[in-house]
């Protein structure tokens, strides 16, 4: 299935990207991947609250083929496999190594030996801090859906849509 998705990137000047940049942070939910939002509103919100170093962010539009993705949002079987895999690995770490599984260890294991080895990416629901997702206090009624893309060949196009201001400052001025 082809999905229209949005990639948020910190704006570092007038030159726009020709392809997305992979996130390589150890605390990224699915480790090293190209992260996309399913909603342009979520992409803009992420830019405003997290892309603060330059005071601006760019939003790019892409078509992503998600046929071989693990869909933890809309596919119940995929969700149950994902949930069970996490719980088994966390328990194994606790019982055999006597420690809690870190996010980095989970992602490294799944990419090298487990669940993510045979998929092109993951569709997942993020927890939102955007007040527009909470019309009723305490109830997130809108899903904030992201894609973590492992196989960049599934990204069919990459087009700059707009630049906007974040809630930050420009440290390069």
Please report, for each region that a protein language model flagged, where it lies by residue.
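Residues that flank catalytic or metal-binding motifs in active/ligand-binding sites
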Residues: 30-33, 58
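Active-site and NAD+-binding cores of ADP-ribose-processing enzymes
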Residues: 3-8, 15-18, 58-173
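ADP-ribose/NAD+-binding catalytic cleft of ART/PARP-like enzymes
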Residues: 1-31, 48
């Amino acid at each position: 299935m082809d999905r229209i998705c949005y990639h948020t990137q910190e704006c570092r000047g007038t030159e726009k990207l020709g392809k997305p940049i992979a996130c390589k942070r150890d605390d990224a939910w699915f480790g090293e991947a190209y992260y996309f939002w399913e909603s342009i509103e979520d992409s803009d919100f992420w830019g405003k609250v997290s892309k603060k170093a330059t005071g601006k962010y760019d939003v790019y539009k892409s078509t992503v083929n998600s046929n071989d993705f693990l869909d933890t949002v809309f596919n119940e079987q995929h969700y149950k496999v994902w949930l069970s895999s996490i719980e088994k690995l966390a328990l194994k770490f606790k019982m055999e190594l006597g420690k809690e599984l870190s996010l980095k260890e989970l992602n490294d294991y799944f990419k090298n030996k487990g669940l993510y080895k045979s998929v092109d990416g993951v569709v997942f629901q993020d927890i939102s801090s955007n007040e527009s997702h909470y019309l009723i206090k305490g109830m997130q009624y809108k899903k904030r859906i992201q894609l973590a893309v492992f196989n960049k060949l599934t990204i069919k196009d990459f087009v700059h849509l707009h630049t906007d201001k974040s809630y930050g400052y420009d440290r390069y001025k």
